[in-house]
């Protein structure tokens, strides 16, 4: 399903709706930037939670993110703490270097992936592994079977014609 949204705020709310986010889901954003998708997801789950025990579990166990840039990681961590996430499950590392099998185990099993990967990082054969499609494949391999994902990519990412792009799309 392809949906356009005019600004990031609307996309954050839209992502929650597209994946039919439930208070039992475990959210993962591997390119979390400032944490906007995680915060939107957390708030939606907290509103749907039945009691304080569920709300506490959501905050402490069900929100996970990775950000590679130190500056953005600092902002994301601050944003999550200011919004009362309880225990910031964010790490400052390279998502593509993470083992998808280990990521699947976070919080009891990642059921929802949100992602706005860095654009236009693949400039040639040496950096083909940095394409938006490679990020999508790695995300899909990192969520549990039956999980859902919402991803923002430029249209050009979906019409890539290189052999590498075609192979990744086939894999996805």
Task: Give the positions of each predicted feature.
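Conserved S-adenosyl-L-methionine
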Residues: 10-112, 120-122, 126-129, 133-134, ...
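Generic detector of intrinsically disordered, low-complexity, polar/charged segments
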Residues: 4, 30-33, 144
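Single conserved hydrophobic/aromatic residue that forms the stacking wall/gate
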Residues: 1-5, 9
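Conserved Class I SAM-dependent methyltransferase catalytic core
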Residues: 127-172
